[in-house]
Amino acid sequence: MPFVERVFSGVQPTGNLHLGNYLGAIVNFVKMQETHNCIYCVVDMHAITQGVDVWGGPVELARNTREVTAAFIASGIDPKKHIVFNQSQVSGHAELAWIFNCVARMGWLGRMTQFKEKAGKDRENASVGLFDYPVLMAADILLYRATHVPVGEDQKQHLELSRDIAQKFNNDFGDSIRAQGTNDGLFFPLPEPFITGPATRVMSLRDGTKKMSKSDASDNSRINLTDDADTIAQKIRKAKTDPEPLPTEEKGLEARPEADNLVGIFAALADRSKADVLRDFGGGQFSSFKNALAELCVTKLAPIAGEMKRLVADPGHIDAILNEGSDRARAIADETMKLSKDIVGFIRRR
């Protein structure tokens, strides 16, 4: 019996969502809901794996969780057709993560490059949660026996670990799984990356060699999803460029990071190729191109900012969406945990 095709997407509530988050992830989340059964999770348990100085404390975490939810809804995700919830409301995430902690090997986690990057040189003071982050991510995905996960370059290694954990669980408990009569001895699927086409990598508006980031000291380096129309237009017009005209061919963007970034943003927002954009603007000055880009950004993003502002002003409404979504998520998760506990040999309440 094949697994039900299901896509699991998670976003950390780290605050200050920006254009990079929108074009790199949220746009694709909106597109895939038209063709797939989707679960959208605000992964607030992952958010606290680093120090409180990073995630901001309880008040900030709650505010950021609601802001991510508002961004989902304002961008077009339908919480009635698909599941939108926050991770901490479903205890199965933590329960399954513990089982997976006993399946995963230390050597597997020791090879995870993101831990090394986030912990830096002071690894002895990093939290166990940060080291164990990939195991919780595997539990997030497999709790819903999701078959596909949209991942960026920085998460591909973690998805591979999820597959390894699923495979080892299936092997370690094969006899018990077969006794349950489940999928020819396979309880968990091996989740595949969800491919939506080339991802848009959005760079800083002040330095085209660096990713757009919420942690950049300059607010002019990014377009926040909460920026109003005037602020968006002003940031685009102040964006760093070089003195040369725009090239007429895509190859001419090489070694011109700021030009490449702005053309890429235009292409992504207009759903066109860079070559197509350059056919319209190649050979011209940046001033006229920036005016067109500012207008496009305002057209696409200002309505999202307005709707986010409206939603965030009513936290009770957002909480109701998360509560309803968590009830639907829990119905799936509870069935997975019931069977997982039976397979492992845990005695559970009946």
From Swiss-Prot:
Gene Ontology CC: cytosol
Reaction equation(s) it catalyzes: tRNA(Trp) + L-tryptophan + ATP = L-tryptophyl-tRNA(Trp) + AMP + diphosphate + H(+)
Motif 'HIGH' region boundaries: 13-21
Motif 'KMSKS' region, residue range(s) on this chain: 211-215
Domain of life per record: Bacteria
Binding sites annotated in the UniProt record for ATP: 12-14, 20-21, 152-154, 202, 211-215
Database matches in InterPro entries: aa-tRNA-synth_I_CS (IPR001412), aa-tRNA-synth_Ic (IPR002305), Rossmann-like_a/b/a_fold (IPR014729), Trp-tRNA-ligase (IPR002306), Trp-tRNA-ligase_bac-type (IPR024109), Trp-tRNA_synthetase (IPR050203)
One example of a Gene Ontology biological process annotation: tryptophanyl-tRNA aminoacylation
Cystine residue pairs: none
EC number of this enzyme: 6.1.1.2
Keywords, alphabetical: Aminoacyl-tRNA synthetase, ATP-binding, Cytoplasm, Ligase, Nucleotide-binding, Protein biosynthesis
Gene Ontology MF, one: tryptophan-tRNA ligase activity
Binding site for L-tryptophan: 140
Keyword Cytoplasm: yes
Predominant cellular place of this UniProt entry's protein: cytoplasm
The keyword Ligase appears for this protein: yes
Subunit-structure text: Homodimer.
The protein's role, per its UniProt record: Catalyzes the attachment of tryptophan to tRNA(Trp).
Matches recorded under PANTHER family: TRYPTOPHAN--TRNA LIGASE, MITOCHONDRIAL
Protein name: Tryptophan--tRNA ligase
Organism whose genome encodes this protein: Bradyrhizobium diazoefficiens (strain JCM 10833 / BCRC 13528 / IAM 13628 / NBRC 14792 / USDA 110)
